[in-house]
A protein has these predicted regions:
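Post-transcriptional modification and biogenesis factors for structured RNAs
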Residues: 1-168
Length: 168
């Protein structure tokens, strides 16, 4: 560790992680992906699943924005979101979409099911989480908003949700 009590990459890899997987589905911006990697590093997130046309950590802009978090946070790439969700289900993860929807649960009210591993799906910056993902998910979580836009940057939304999940 250095003077700021930061773990080395190896210490981070060995550290116990929060049983949360972040699934990024068709995120356009490499900068948003890099930001989410940094957030995942900050909160000891288990893994990030990259789906669809989401830029992978090997993309120059993701790597630059992530400030090294692509080396500490595990990640996997999937051609389709369905493939990713199938793998999550096979490994006993509950899948929750982050989206504004009729039957969504407020993030303030959401409680992680006891002894359950969870995956959180963040969708495209313009169209959000796909309908097919909403149908496959165990539920939908919504970030309460009080302004006029009811729209958050996906990187900001990831930070809010992940902070809440690791600080119930």
């Amino acid at each position: 560790m250095d003077e700021l009590n930061r773990k080395t990459v190896e210490e981070f890899k060995q550290a116990e992680k929060n049983k949360i997987i972040v699934l990024l589905d068709n995120i356009r911006s490499a900068y948003n992906v890099g930001s989410i990697f940094r957030t995942a590093d900050a909160f000891l997130i288990e893994c990030i699943f990259i789906c669809g046309y989401t830029p992978p950590p090997t993309h120059r802009s993701v790597h630059k924005t992530a400030l090294g978090a692509v080396d500490t946070v595990d990640w996997m790439q999937f051609d389709t979101v369905e493939d990713a969700i199938n793998q999550l289900r096979e490994n006993d993860y509950a899948v929750y979409a982050i989206e504004q929807a009729e039957k969504s649960i407020s993030l303030e009210q959401f409680q992680v099911p006891l002894n359950k591993k969870i995956a959180i799906v963040f969708g495209n910056e313009v169209v959000g989480v796909q309908d097919k993902v909403m149908q496959l998910a165990n539920g939908c979580i919504e970030i309460p908003q009080h302004g006029m836009k009811h729209s958050l940057n996906v990187g900001v939304a990831a930070g809010i949700v992940l902070w809440k999940l690791v600080h119930p």
